Curated annotation (Swiss-Prot):
This is Carboxysome shell protein CcmK4. It comes from Synechococcus elongatus (strain ATCC 33912 / PCC 7942 / FACHB-805). One of its GO terms (molecular function) is structural constituent of carboxysome shell. Keywords: Bacterial microcompartment, Carbon dioxide fixation, Carboxysome, Photosynthesis. Its main location: other. Belongs to the bacterial microcompartments protein family. CcmK subfamily. Homohexamer. Interacts stably with CcmK3, probably forms heterohexamers with a 1:2 CcmK3:CcmK4 stoichiometry. It is found in: Carboxysome. The keyword 4Fe-4S does not apply. It comes from the Bacteria. CDD domains: BMC_CcmK (cd07057).
Amino acid sequence: MSQQAIGSLETKGFPPILAAADAMVKAGRITIVSYMRAGSARFAVNIRGDVSEVKTAMDAGIEAAKNTPGGTLETWVIIPRPHENVEAVFPIGFGPEVEQYRLSAEGTGSGRR
């Protein structure tokens, strides 16, 4: 099992997912690992990081999504230590496009923050 948590947040409308993503990266030392359109006007963002950092970031993202005019927070989940099978199948891994941000969040690199 992974030592890093996964957080997933889904909204109805683009502005609340954008606000949530921004709030999450500002609130916790996390990395956004994927963003997707989940259906008609529904969007999801997935984050990774230490359990406590993901919880802090998700709290900020939930509040930001709830407070965005015209948008709706649909659902969210935090999985503290996802099983490796989940990581192998779902788009929640650290791809090369987010490596600099992961290193910065973990304090081991000089990525942008």
